[in-house]
């Protein structure tokens, strides 16, 4: 019997700068949903990606002295590295510069044009380049006047200056779909979540009247061109939104994924783009005669005490720093526990450290440590088999375990992650209290209470197992460590379905002889200071401290190193290594194999076709049994590694001097 499918998407991110913790928030939330649904037995498809067209990208690339795709490839490598670091379990990564996407955008645009939903006109409005959005005069912030007429202002979204732009444009006649859209809302009351977003869409945008939408531009070239009128570039409203179906192969030679997974179960995004997903996207799908997604969920923003994150304010949080210092689980846990999903939440270093110390180290970590230590002390490490409830406290714990699963499931289905985690932690806290109530240290002094003591241990381990299973969507490491230390090796005991009945560990098991702390406690004062320091804006050139240099060398020393241009023609993972890739490079006169420690930052598909710099006169070496004949140059800063890419015009074998 085929599994029930579940298709979830994040927004596709605009790669004009480094991603911050707000972007990580959306993607981790999507990952939690995907892992939860897989744990329930669904056939899940999880999509994320990047929106890579537009004037802003064109200008950024020009400023960097690169082609658009060269600039984008570097930015996307950083995004993929962050997703890998966050252990995002996406099944696909769509780039709007990919042919599979552009092909769909072209066909969709021409179809809408042919059937009269798109028409040619002229557009004039106040345009913000960073936001890639037009605004009406009434929407502008800090409008500037001259002789009673508006001559400028700022974007209500970003605060950037706007400019008056007039250009020929194609328009999407969305106004004719107004009644049909409202009817869909009525028939599908849970389509937009939280409900407050639905009211906002109806009262602020639909009831005042939907204006037809400008869906092409002639003021820049970087994008998908309209096939029948190439001076026009398809604008973001169609280009970006179509990714959700282009990634499934819609209008391709193989539509099997589209037929299997569409419509999407959840489109996940931050609240500032809910309008595009709850108004424009449904109307676009109606025009294409396609089923509409089942749910659009708009979460809130991660705010700081002084408002939105901003580099100039010195309050931007880099998720890389949190992961590197405190671990992935602590970072993912904080994001999903502290911030109520669907509402705005405030990030504070104090709360991050407190959650790590009290919830993870004290409540969960100490429970695991105490339990294993008692089993080693009282039963020489062998956990007695579960015997059922022997007194009222056992019955109470078993009932609470089953009720916890029920409440957790209800919260997860409604995407209330902080509530789901709170439910699990109430159960963990109650289990800690159960130790104090049953007093194992007293029972151990009375041989007649040996069975009772053993059953207390069995209940503790079963409760910990319940918690570990429920935490699997959120924490990618701790549940595995808990199962390992408890020596629970049967995969079926790690599955969600195993929680339907309490007390499945009916055979004795040997726990680890020496429990290891899963979450070490943090020095609160020092770590709060560290996080605050990491949030400061970058130093100016005058403020930067000189980076210690290596000893100077003369030109003769440098001349000993031979560096040549090469193209990566093949790559694969080295077996039994999570760090190494085995790479084949073309040096024109020869091909070589190089083993490189970049697997945590790049997949094989990411690097095939890249032009790189190779040190060719290193002595051959063996790494994990694989011969390596050189070294590919890379750059590293703040724990992020990036390959040194060369312009494609440089021929293979060219010597770099």
From Swiss-Prot:
Q: EC number(s) on record?
A: 6.1.1.10
UniProt keywords (A-Z) are: Aminoacyl-tRNA synthetase, ATP-binding, Cytoplasm, Ligase, Nucleotide-binding, Protein biosynthesis, RNA-binding, tRNA-binding
User: Which CDD domains does the protein's record reference?
Assistant: Anticodon_Ia_Met, MetRS_core, tRNA_bind_EcMetRS_like
Output the Gene Ontology cellular-component terms: cytoplasm
The parts of the chain that form a coiled coil are: none
Listed GO MF terms:
ATP binding; methionine-tRNA ligase activity; tRNA binding
Q: What class of enzyme is it?
A: ligase
Residue span of motif 'KMSKS' region? 308-312
Q: Where is the tRNA-binding domain?
A: 557-657
Q: Where is this motif: 'HIGH' region?
A: 13-23
Q: Where in the cell is it found?
A: Cytoplasm
Record-linked InterPro entries: aa-tRNA-synth_I_CS, Anticodon_Met, M/V/L/I-tRNA-synth_anticd-bd, Met-tRNA-synth_bsu_C, Met-tRNA_synth, Met-tRNA_synth_2, Methionyl/Leucyl_tRNA_Synth, MetRS_core
Query: What Gene3D superfamilies is this protein classified in?
Result: 2.170.220.10, HUPs (3.40.50.620), Isoleucyl-tRNA Synthetase, Domain 1 (1.10.730.10), Nucleic acid-binding proteins (2.40.50.140)
Subunit description: Homodimer.
**Family the UniProt entry places it in:** Belongs to the class-I aminoacyl-tRNA synthetase family. MetG type 2B subfamily.
Biological role = Is required not only for elongation of protein synthesis but also for the initiation of all mRNA translation through initiator tRNA(fMet) aminoacylation.
Q: What is this protein called?
A: Methionine--tRNA ligase
Q: Which organism is it from?
A: Staphylococcus aureus (strain MRSA252)
């Amino acid at each position: 019997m085929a599994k029930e499918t579940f298709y979830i998407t994040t927004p596709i991110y605009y790669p004009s700068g480094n991603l911050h913790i707000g972007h990580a928030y959306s993607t981790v939330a999507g990952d939690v949903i995907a892992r939860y649904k897989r744990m329930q037995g669904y056939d899940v498809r999880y999509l994320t990606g990047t929106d890579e067209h537009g004037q802003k990208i064109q200008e950024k690339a020009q400023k960097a002295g690169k082609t658009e795709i060269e600039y984008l490839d570097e930015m996307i490598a950083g995004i993929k590295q962050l997703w890998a670091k966050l252990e995002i379990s996406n099944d696909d990564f769509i780039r709007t510069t990919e042919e599979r996407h552009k092909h769909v955008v072209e066909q969709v645009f021409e179809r809408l044009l042919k059937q009269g939903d798109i028409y040619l006109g002229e557009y004039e409005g106040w345009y913000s380049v960073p936001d890639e959005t037009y605004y009406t005069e009434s929407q502008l912030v800090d409008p500037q006047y001259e002789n009673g007429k508006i001559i400028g202002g700022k974007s209500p979204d970003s605060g950037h200056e706007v400019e008056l732009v007039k250009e020929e444009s194609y328009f999407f006649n969305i106004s004719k779909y107004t009644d049909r859209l409202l009817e869909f809302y009525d028939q599908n009351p849970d389509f937009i979540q939280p409900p407050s977003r639905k009211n906002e869409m109806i009262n602020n945008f639909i009831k005042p009247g939907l204006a037809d939408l400008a869906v092409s531009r002639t003021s820049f070239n970087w994008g998908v061109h309209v096939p029948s009128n190439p001076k026009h570039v398809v604008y973001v409203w169609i280009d970006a939104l179509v990714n959700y179906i282009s990634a499934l192969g819609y209008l391709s030679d193989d539509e099997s994924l589209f037929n299997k997974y569409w419509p999407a179960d959840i489109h996940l995004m931050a609240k500032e783009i809910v309008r595009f997903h709850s108004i424009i996207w449904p109307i676009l799908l109606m025009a294409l005669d396609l089923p509409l997604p089942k749910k659009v969920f708009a979460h809130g923003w991660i705010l700081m005490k002084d408002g939105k994150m901003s580099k100039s304010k010195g309050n931007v949080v880099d998720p890389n720093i949190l992961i590197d210092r405190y671990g992935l689980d602590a970072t993912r846990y904080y994001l999903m526990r502290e911030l109520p999903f669907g509402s705005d939440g405030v990030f504070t270093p104090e709360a991050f450290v407190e959650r790590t110390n009290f919830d993870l180290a004290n409540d969960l970590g100490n429970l695991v440590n105490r339990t294993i230590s008692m089993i080693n002390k009282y039963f020489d490490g062998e956990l007695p088999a579960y015997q059922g409830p022997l007194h009222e406290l056992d019955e109470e714990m078993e009932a609470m375990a089953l009720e916890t699963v029920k409440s957790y499931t209800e919260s997860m289905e409604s995407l209330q992650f902080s509530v789901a985690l709170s439910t699990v932690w109430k159960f963990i806290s109650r289990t800690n209290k159960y130790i104090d109530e049953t007093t194992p240290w007293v029972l151990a002094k009375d041989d007649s209470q040996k069975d009772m003591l053993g059953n207390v241990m069995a209940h503790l381990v079963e409760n910990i197992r319940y918690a570990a299973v429920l935490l699997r969507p959120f924490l990618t490491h701790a549940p595995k460590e808990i199962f390992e230390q408890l020596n629970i090796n049967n995969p079926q005991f790690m599955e969600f379905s195993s929680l339907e009945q309490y007390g499945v560990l009916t055979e004795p098991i040997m726990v680890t002889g020496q429990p290891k702390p899963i979450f070490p406690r943090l020095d609160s004062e020092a770590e709060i200071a560290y996080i605050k320091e990491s949030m400061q804006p970058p130093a100016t050139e005058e403020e930067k401290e000189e980076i210690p240099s290596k000893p100077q060398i003369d030109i003769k020393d440098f001349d000993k190193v031979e560096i040549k241009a090469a193209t990566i023609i093949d790559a694969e993972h080295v077996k039994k290594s999570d760090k190494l890739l085995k790479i084949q490079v073309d040096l024109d006169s020869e091909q070589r194999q190089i083993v490189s420690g970049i697997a945590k930052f790049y997949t094989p598909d990411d690097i095939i076709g890249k032009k790189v710099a190779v040190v060719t006169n290193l002595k051959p070496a063996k790494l994990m049994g694989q011969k390596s004949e050189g070294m590919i140059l890379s750059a590293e800063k703040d724990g992020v590694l990036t390959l040194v890419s060369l312009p494609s015009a440089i021929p293979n074998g060219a010597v770099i001097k």
